[in-house]
Amino acid sequence: MHKLLKILLAGLVCLGSMVPAFADESAGVLPCTLTAENGTPVWQLSDQNRSTKLDWSGGTLTVESTEPITGLYLIWDRPPEPWTGTAGSQTLSGGEYGFLHEYFPLESPVTRAELTLPEGSRCCDVYAFGEGELPDWVQQWQPPLADADLLVLPTHADDEHLFFGGTMPYYAGELGKKVQVVYFTNHWAEPYRPHELLDGLWTVGIRNYPVMSSFVDQYADSLDYARTLYDEEEAVAWQVQQLRRFKPEVVVGHDVNGEYGHGVHMYNADTLMQALELSADPSYDPESAQKWGVWDVPKTYLHLWPENPIVMDWSQPLSAFGGKTAVEMARLGFAEHVSQQTFFKVEDYGPYDCRKFGLYRSLVGLDAQGGDFFENLAAGDYSDYLPPEPEPEPEPVSEPEPERTRTLPGWTLLAGMVGAVALAEGMILYGRRRKR
């Protein structure tokens, strides 16, 4: 009887250790073969290294695996042109929004997919995934917003974390507001930085793809010098276009002194301030007024603006991020900018304190409470854009679901073992009493 009890207990321990594995299954990267149309292996796209890339010469890329593929993930070096492909009976289409990181869930598992990529496109990696939950690092971007609650206007990739701190994790990740990020410069001359940009945004809860301007990243040590680098009329018009396109209730911009004195930060703030006075005027840039309509931003905050100051509380735990605070998430977002890990860091203290902002412009009065960019804005004032709801599919007629114990044989076995252990223990105790 003691031997039986030991066997049952051992089986119970083994079964218990298997339960977390069932609950923790996730999709892994599948081993796959990538070949060009002429049959040549394309190793550059399967090394999981963004620094190796391939200039596609045209034709079809074939992705094959011995295991069922349920999703494909493409990493581009530059925004791709539209492209198509097939995976079984499913037609794939990509490149519509120029996403550098594109994920495609497949309707049915396949072991072979064919992608017709544009000639001259430059790709870094192609991943195939199997059944299960995708890893957190796989980014499933949505297009830029048609209507934003909050527009964040950093100058460079990493400024959004360094100087705007917990803005994105708190408002986008925790509160679920529609946050659009628009960068004044681009980093195409440093091809690793756009990837870092996307990784950082994804980390802090941004899900709508960012906008990157056509202005090349350059350094200036003053506002006057920055004005020699860019066409100011073009820059102001671009700022107006962003305000009209996204129609934000709140805009967050840079310090007019450029935080640590960066002239292009100053220039971004200066052209934004000009644009705020022009975006509601239909006679200014009539082409964008015709395309998007005009817009007068209700509230604008600038980093470190001395008037009407507020100090944001980025120290509260956020349930959306497992209890991490907004400033902790900002630091994790900045950590994705591997190339920028020098002497800058996200600081919630000191001269560049990422918590400190000032209400530069308001159509709804001054803040009384402070600590919330949306103070004095009622819920009806924003989030007024709703995407069209899909037509509901008719519910299929189905048989009643079987009992849960039938669909979870492991738990049935577990319950049986527990009962057997209890019975065995009772028999042992009964035998001992009889001997006494």
Give the residues covered by each predicted segment:
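The feature marks non-catalytic terminal segments
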Residues: 25-53, 76, 88, 102-106, ...
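Sec-dependent signal peptide recognition
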Residues: 2-10
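Residues in and immediately flanking transmembrane alpha helices
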Residues: 16-19, 169-171
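Sec-dependent signal peptide cleavage junction
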Residues: 17-26, 403-411, 429-433
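Active-site beta-strand->loop->alpha-helix modules in alpha/beta enzyme cores, enriched
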Residues: 27-61, 65-285
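Hydrophobic core
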Residues: 13-17, 423
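C-terminal membrane-anchoring or membrane-association module
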Residues: 417-436
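Short, intrinsically disordered, low-complexity terminal segments
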Residues: 7, 20, 417-419
